[in-house]
Each structure stands twice: as structure tokens, then as C-alpha cells.
Swiss-Prot record:
Subcellular location(s) of the protein: Cytoplasm; Nucleus
Stretches for region Disordered: 213-255
Family in the record: Belongs to the nucleosome assembly protein (NAP) family.
Gene3D superfamilies on file: 1.20.5.1500, Nucleosome assembly protein
Name of this chain's protein: NAP1-related protein 2
Length: 255
């Protein structure tokens, strides 16, 4: 009886060892396949970057041409910003006055694409600051952090960093923010390297949403004005129809 139990225990132990060995072998094979996939993914990423680098060069003169046309349209960037659902909330009344001098906006990837990008605001001569260009640069570091640098603004005498006041909402007008948009540049002077997940949300919106097609947001504002105008026309037409109906009722009553 004891011998049978001993044999059974030994058999179970051998089965467990066999299962463990098979499991280890399967995991090793799975890891090899996963390593192969990683190599393919790395190669794909490198090739995607090469394509992106190639087309960045091709896009550059087209973006330059777009900027030249935009310069001929009054308040283009101010209108596009104000019409954007996120960016429009960031401009104080004083910011809007400054944005009237904004002549061009440029987003430029680093040459290798993966190491970062910069956003540059170019201004016509204005009464607010000396700078012709304000640039904010994002450099992606190997340790997973991002180095952020920005042009220190040289405000003209008596101007300084424009901090708005909290304006009450008037009718359908949006409530204006308390802090100037231009703190976006000055904040970078006080920041150390930040983690990737703490990336600059404003920069992401400008780079990924506004910059690719600002005309979408510029036209949004124009479309809304046209829509409001159509509404006014419809209301006038309805009032005219109502007056005609009243006249007809009066004539029937006189008969």
C-alpha cells in the first residue's frame, strides 16, 4: 500500500516537472516571437520616420506659400484662434489686441522628427514688445522627459506681461480668461524637464489640430456669421408674412 502511494507521488511529481518544462519552453518560444515582432516594429518606425522626414521637406515650401497668402487676410490667426473651441478660451482682451499683429504661425519638426519640434509666432512691428518672433521648443530626451524652452518676451516700456481681469459673461459672449495667453512663453522659463504624459496641451492642439488646417476654424467663424445673418433674414421674412396675414384678416372682417 505504501509502495503504491510512493509510486503515485513520484508519477505526479514527474508529470508536474514535465508540465513545467513544457511551459518554460512555450514561454521561451513566445519570447522569441515577441522579439521578432519588436525588431519588425522598430524597422517600421524607422521607415515611417524616413517617410515623414521626406514629406516634411516637400511640405515646407507649400506651408511657406500658405503663410504668404494668410498675411494678406486681416486678422486671420486671431479669427482662427477665437473660433477654435479650446484655444479661443485662452485669449484675454489684451491678447486679442496683440494677436492683430500676428502675421504668421509655423510648426517645425526637428530634422529627425522624433527628437522634438518648435512653434513660432511671427509678429509685425507692434506697440507691445520688441520681438519679431516668439518661439517655444520641445526637445524629447532619451530618459523619457521633455525639455521645454521659449523666447523670453522683451516687453516695451509700460506694457509688461498682460494679465487680463475676469470679465463677466455679457450676453452670448464668452467669459474672458484671467491669465494672458503669453504666459505660455514665460512659463517655460521656470519649468524643468517634464514627463511625456505632462506634455504641453496647448502645443499639442496647435501642432496637431490648428496648424494642419487653420482655414477650417477661420471659416467656422465666417459660417457662424452667415448663419446668424440667415436667421435674421428668416425672422424678417416671417414677420413680413405675419403682417400680410393680419392685413388679410382685416379685409375679411370689413367684408
Amino acid at each position: 500500500m505504501v509502495t503504491d502511494k510512493s509510486k503515485k507521488a513520484k508519477t505526479e511529481e514527474e508529470n508536474v516537472e514535465q508540465i513545467d518544462a513544457e511551459l518554460v519552453l512555450s514561454i521561451e518560444k513566445l519570447q522569441e516571437i515577441q522579439d521578432d515582432l519588436e525588431k519588425i516594429n522598430e524597422k517600421a518606425s524607422d521607415e515611417v520616420l524616413e517617410v515623414e522626414q521626406k514629406y516634411n521637406v516637400i511640405r515646407k515650401p507649400v506651408y511657406d506659400k500658405r503663410n504668404e497668402i494668410i498675411k494678406t487676410i486681416p486678422d486671420f490667426w486671431l479669427t482662427a484662434f477665437l473660433s477654435h473651441p479650446a484655444l479661443g478660451e485662452l485669449l484675454t482682451e489684451e491678447d486679442q489686441k496683440i494677436f492683430k499683429y500676428l502675421s504668421s504661425l509655423d510648426v517645425e519638426d526637428a530634422k529627425d522628427v522624433k527628437s522634438g519640434y518648435s512653434i513660432t509666432f511671427s509678429f509685425n512691428p507692434n506697440p507691445f514688445f520688441e520681438d519679431g518672433k516668439l518661439t517655444k521648443t520641445f526637445t524629447f530626451l532619451e530618459e523619457g522627459t521633455t525639455k521645454i524652452t521659449a523666447t523670453p518676451i522683451k516687453w516695451k516700456e509700460g506694457k509688461g506681461l498682460a494679465n487680463g481681469v475676469n470679465h463677466e459673461k455679457n450676453g452670448n459672449k464668452r467669459a474672458l480668461p484671467e491669465e494672458s495667453f503669453f504666459t505660455w512663453f514665460s512659463d517655460a522659463q521656470h519649468k524643468e524637464d517634464v514627463e511625456d504624459e505632462m506634455q504641453d496641451e496647448v502645443a499639442d492642439i496647435i501642432k496637431e489640430d490648428l496648424w494642419p488646417n487653420p482655414l477650417t476654424y477661420f471659416n467656422n467663424d465666417a459660417d457662424e456669421e452667415d448663419f446668424d445673418g440667415d436667421d435674421d433674414g428668416d425672422e424678417e421674412e416671417k414677420e413680413g408674412d405675419s403682417d400680410e396675414d393680419d392685413d388679410e384678416e382685416d379685409e375679411v372682417g370689413e367684408e
